Amino acid sequence: MKKIFQFITAIAVVAPVAISATSEPLTEAALLTASTISQAMKAMPANAALDQPLRTVDGGTANVGIFIVHRPQEPDQGCTIEHDTLVNDRTTSIFLVLDGAGTLVTGGRLANPVPLSSDDPDLKLVGSGSRGDGIQNGRSRRISKGDVVIIPAGVPHGFSAVEKSITYEVVRIDSGKILPLK
C-alpha cells in the first residue's frame, strides 16, 4: 500500500487535476466536469493500482468525496482474496464502474482484521476502518461497466478477481469526517 500511496503522490505532482482545495463550507453545489474526470483517468497508468481523490467537500454531517480507482489484473489472483480487503467503520462507498470488470466480494466477515493506523496513507483515502486477509462467507458478484454498487459502512469488501482491469468512480460518504477536504 505504501508503494501505491507514493505512486498517487507522484501522479498528483506530475499530472495535477484542476480542482481547487477549500476548507470553507460550500454555499453552492460542487461540480466535477466530464473533462476533469477524463483527465484523471488518462493520467492513470494501465498497470498500477491507483485510488485518486478528485474532490472532497464538507457535507454537513459527513465529508463527501469523489475518487477514481483503477485496478489492473494481478498475476497472483485466484479464487480467494488475500489482500486489499477492507471494512470501513463510518464510510459508505458507492461504486460506479466506468470501464472493465471484476468479481467483487461483499458482506460476511473480514478475516484477521487489523485497524488502519493513524499514519496509514489509506486512512485519507477510505476513512477509518480495518484491513484484512480476506473475507469469510461473503457474496461474490461480477460487476462491469455501468454497474453501481452501494457498500454501507461496516460491510467488508474487496475484489477476488479483475478481468484485465477495472476503473470505477467512488463516492465516499464519511460520517467520521476523516477524509481531508480537497
Functional labels for PLM-detected ranges:
Residues R142-P156, S160-V162:
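Conserved metal-binding segment of the jelly-roll/cupin
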Residues I8-A18:
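Bacterial N-terminal signal peptides
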Residues M1-I8:
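Bacterial N-terminal signal peptides that target proteins for export
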Residues D84-V87, S93-L96, S140-R141, V148-V149:
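His/acidic/aromatic-lined binding-pocket segments of jelly-roll/cupin-type domains
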Residues I19-D89:
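A short, N-terminal "cap"/entry segment at the start of jelly-roll beta-barrel domains
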